[in-house]
Design a protein with these regions (language model features):
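Active-site recognition of the HExxH zinc-binding catalytic motif
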Residues: 201-218
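C-terminal motif of bacterial Sec signal peptides marking the signal peptidase cleavage site
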Residues: 15-18
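Bacterial lipoprotein signal-peptidase II cleavage site
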Residues: 20-26
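Active-site scaffold of zinc-dependent metalloenzymes
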Residues: 162-197, 240
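Active-site rim elements
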Residues: 66-67, 191-201, 222-223
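Propeptide-to-catalytic entry region of secreted or membrane-anchored zinc metalloproteases
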Residues: 28-150, 155-167, 314-335, 341-343
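Sec-dependent signal peptide recognition
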Residues: 2-10
Length: 357
C-alpha cells in the first residue's frame, strides 16, 4: 500500500463463485473449461506476468447469476487490458498492463463463489466487508488459485429490471474493488446509444474505474491542455464517457500502475509491505505562469515515480475527481521537481490542496 505522510498539505508515498439457483450452464465450470483448453496456446501479451488479477463472481444465495457472464466479462476485461497498455505506452512505461488468469485468449478464469447469505448481508453500503471475508476464506482453502493481492469482485444485480440495475457494493477499497453484473453488461452495447448504450457505459466504465482503484489509482482529472486529444480521465469522470468518447489514463494513473503488483514482470516478496517516507525539504516558485515544486525525501524502500495533485476545494475523498496532476521520475536517489503550468488548471479561483505521492 502507498503510505502517506502529511507535510502541511503535501505528502510523500511509495508508489511502489456453485448453487442450484444459478443460471450458469455446467459447461462453464472452471474445471471443464480448463480441461477443454488444457492444450490451448495462450498468446496474450501479458500472460507471462507473474501476478494476475483475481476475478471473482460472487453470488448471494438468494440471487441468480446472469447468463453468459464469463464470455461477457472476459471481453470487457481483455479490452480494458489492451486499453491500459496503449495508455501506459504513451506515458513512457512500454505496453505494461495487468495480468489476467486466462483459460484461452478469449476467456478469463473467473472464480465463482456462492455467498453463505442472502443479498441483505451484502448491501451497497458496507456490504463489501462480508463479501471480502468470504472471498478470503475461499482463497484460504484454495491458495494456488490466488494470483495476486488484487481482486475484482463482481456481483449480480439485486434488481432484476435491466433498465435499473443496482444493489451490491460498487467501489474500490484497498487492493479490492466491487462491481455489478446485469443482462446488458456487454461490450457490444458500448456506444450504441439509447438507454442500453448509456447504461453500458455507466456500468462498464464504472467497473473499469473501480478496477483502477483496486489497482491503487486515485481520482484525478485530465490536465486541460491534454483534454482535446486524450479526452476524459478514466479516474475522473471516465465512467460516463467509456465507450462513447476518448477516455484515457492520466500520467499519474500510469505512474501508479507502473508500481502495481499485477503490472510487474518480476516477482517480489515485499509487495505492499510496511514502508515509511518523509519529505525533508520542499520549495515552490512561480515563473512564466508555471508553478514549480521541488524537494527532497527519504524512504526506506526504492521510489520509482512521484506524483503531485492539485485538488481544488472541497478537498479529498470523493471530492477529488477534479484534481489535476503531474507525474515524474525521481532525480538521483532522493529529489523531485514538477512544473505545473496554469494553462492546465480549469479554475484559478478558490483554494487548492497540494498532495505529493
Amino acid at each position: 500500500m502507498r503510505k502517506f505522510l502529511n507535510l502541511i498539505v503535501a505528502s510523500l508515498a511509495l508508489l511502489t463463485a456453485s448453487c442450484s439457483k444459478t443460471l450458469i450452464n455446467t459447461t462453464e465450470s472452471v474445471g471443464t473449461l480448463k480441461a477443454k483448453n488444457s492444450t490451448a496456446t495462450v498468446i496474450n501479451e501479458w500472460n507471462s506476468n507473474p501476478y494476475k488479477l483475481n476475478v471473482i463472481y460472487f453470488v448471494p444465495n438468494d440471487v441468480d447469476s446472469i447468463p453468459n457472464f464469463r464470455k461477457r466479462l472476459s471481453r470487457i476485461l481483455l479490452n480494458a487490458q489492451n486499453m491500459f497498455a496503449n495508455n501506459m505506452d504513451r506515458e513512457g512505461f512500454s505496453r505494461k498492463s495487468f495480468g489476467l488468469d486466462l483459460v484461452n485468449d478469449t476467456l478469463i478464469n473467473i472464480h465463482y463463489i456462492t455467498g453463505q447469505f442472502g443479498k441483505a448481508t451484502y448491501p451497497y453500503s458496507g456490504g463489501n466487508g462480508a463479501v471480502k471475508t468470504e472471498v478470503d476464506a475461499y482463497f484460504g482453502q484454495n491458495p494456488l488459485a490466488k494470483k495476486s493481492e488484487h481482486n475484482l469482485i463482481i456481483i449480480p444485480t439485486y434488481n432484476t429490471d435491466p433498465a435499473n440495475p443496482g444493489g451490491p457494493p460498487f467501489y474500490g477499497t484497498g487492493t479490492s474493488c466491487y462491481a455489478l453484473d446485469y443482462v446488458n453488461l456487454d461490450a457490444k452495447n458500448l456506444g450504441i446509444g439509447g438507454d442500453i448504450g448509456w447504461k453500458a457505459t455507466v456500468w462498464i466504465g464504472g467497473m473499469i474505474h473501480e478496477l483502477g482503484h483496486g489497482l491503487n489509482a486515485s481520482h484525478n482529472r485530465m490536465n486541460k491542455t491534454l483534454a482535446p486529444t486524450l479526452g476524459t480521465a478514466l479516474m475522473g469522470s471516465g465512467n460516463s464517457t467509456y465507450g462513447i468518447s476518448t477516455t484515457s489514463l492520466t500520467s499519474s494513473t500510469a505512474a501508479t500502475f507502473n508500481n502495481s503488483q499485477v503490472f510487474s514482470s518480476v516477482t517480489r516478496s515485499d509487495w505492499y509491505a510496511s514502508a515509511s517516507a518523509e519529505i525533508i525539504s520542499l520549495s515552490s516558485s512561480f515563473t512564466n505562469n508555471t508553478i514549480i515544486i521541488s524537494g527532497k525525501f527519504t524512504a526506506n524502500k526504492p521510489v520509482n515515480d512521484i506524483v503531485v495533485w492539485h485538488d481544488r476545494e472541497p478537498f479529498g475523498g470523493n471530492n477529488d475527481y477534479d484534481a489535476v496532476q503531474w507525474a515524474t521520475k525521481i532525480i538521483g536517489q532522493d529529489s523531485f521537481r514538477f512544473e505545473c503550468p496554469l494553462a492546465d488548471f480549469y479554475d484559478l479561483t478558490g483554494n487548492y490542496e497540494m498532495r505529493i505521492g
